[in-house]
Amino acid sequence: AVPIRNDFPLDKASLLGCAVMTGYGGAIYAGKIKPADRVFVIGCGAVGLSAIQGARLAGASVIIAVAINDKKLKLAKSMGATHNINDLNHNPAEVTKELTFGRGADCVIEAAGQNVSIQQSLEASRPGARVVILGKTPFGEKINFPFNLMMGEREIVRTSYGMSRPRIDFPKLADLYMTQKLILDPMISMRLKLENINHGFDELEKGNVARSLVIFD
């Protein structure tokens, strides 16, 4: 157990344990984002949205959000993304190169957990970039991409919790929320009772929610 401030709302606290901590840590610790960095985040679920906020809090100058759901992209914009790309309509790597004057992103955060999104992450990165893989593909699935995408001194990092330190970072994230620097309220897309849990899973599978809360009366 990690103690947090007493005035921190418990419904918001329930978000910290996995998605928010992973995305924030992926940007701050694993991604090592610095002021003025250009950042590419693919996947705008709760993990990706938290990574976008981590990039904003780190001082990134360009934050490119990529998803296939326009509602999620709108949410990403409200959390700090400076540019949105719907990759059903555009090639994310090509648009990123245009937005970064041909360079590519300094830091890339993959939060979609798909074979194609991992390849797109590498394609969008500049030589010497740090590519952080937060998403998880189905267990046992093989990842295939051209070897040349690993060239150019790119550093590829795989982390499940963003290299976060719960005893330090839980209280820090609570403070960031209470001082209105971390946005959590819009991440709660739905509140439902336990007997409606299957509806929550259906909406999650459709990509309609960032996070659902199960309320026990």
Regions inferred by a protein language model and the residue ranges of each:
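NAD(P)H dinucleotide-binding glycine-rich loop of Rossmann-like/cofactor-binding domains
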Residues: 1-42
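Local beta-strand N-terminus motif with an aromatic residue
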Residues: 36, 81, 104-105, 184, ...
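Adenosine-nucleotide cofactor-binding segment
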Residues: 41-44, 56-120
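N-terminal Rossmann-fold NAD(P) dinucleotide-binding loop
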Residues: 48-49
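Residues in the short beta-alpha loop(s) of Rossmann-like NAD(P)-binding domains
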Residues: 69, 137, 162
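C-terminal hydrophobic helical "lid"/dimerization subdomain
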Residues: 119-123, 127, 167-217
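Glycine-centered, small-residue-biased loops immediately flanking beta-strands
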Residues: 129-130, 154
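Rossmann-fold NAD(P)-binding glycine/threonine-rich loop
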Residues: 135-153, 170-173
